[in-house]
Regions:
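Terminal alpha-helical segments
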Residues: 1-145
């Protein structure tokens, strides 16, 4: 079954809200799997929370990429380097992708409780910052109308 293109499902803000909801759901699942001691799964869901949060930010511009690499690269270039989002967060996003990849594909990777907790913390922080950024942007546009 063909998935609808993000531009076919409503306004840009509809797509932003949907992607933020998916990011929140992923973060909730990361917390649940973490509490159950399923650290590999929690790393996966924390990363996807980060990824869907970034996709929400890019959706505000009407931008979407097919590959994660392109999405993360664009976000770092256009949001982290100009310090719309903190540079330290950019480094944590790169680390999150590496850990998710190891958790998913390296059968000998042992996901630690500490690193997984850091991943979840990073996901929560970027979601918080993105929601604040997107809300501020939306309010500014409404005031201009």
């Amino acid at each position: 079954m063909k998935q609808p293109d993000s531009l076919d499902v409503g306004t840009k803000m509809d797509v932003v809200r949907h992607r933020l909801n998916v990011a929140r759901e992923d973060l909730d699942t990361a917390h649940l799997t973490f509490k159950a001691g399923k650290y590999r799964a929690a790393n996966n869901r924390a990363y996807y929370s980060i990824f869907h949060t970034i996709c929400a930010v890019l959706a505000k511009e009407g931008i979407a990429f097919k590959r994660h690499k392109d999405t993360l690269s664009y976000f770092n270039k256009n949001y982290v380097q100009p310090e719309i989002f903190p540079r330290e967060l950019g480094r944590k996003i790169v680390k999150a992708e590496e850990i998710r990849h190891a958790s998913d594909y390296d059968t000998f990777y042992i996901a630690s409780k500490e690193i997984t907790a850091q991943q979840i913390e990073t996901a929560a922080k970027i979601l918080e910052l993105a929601e604040k950024y997107l809300l501020t942007e939306s309010e500014q546009q409404e005031n201009e109308i």
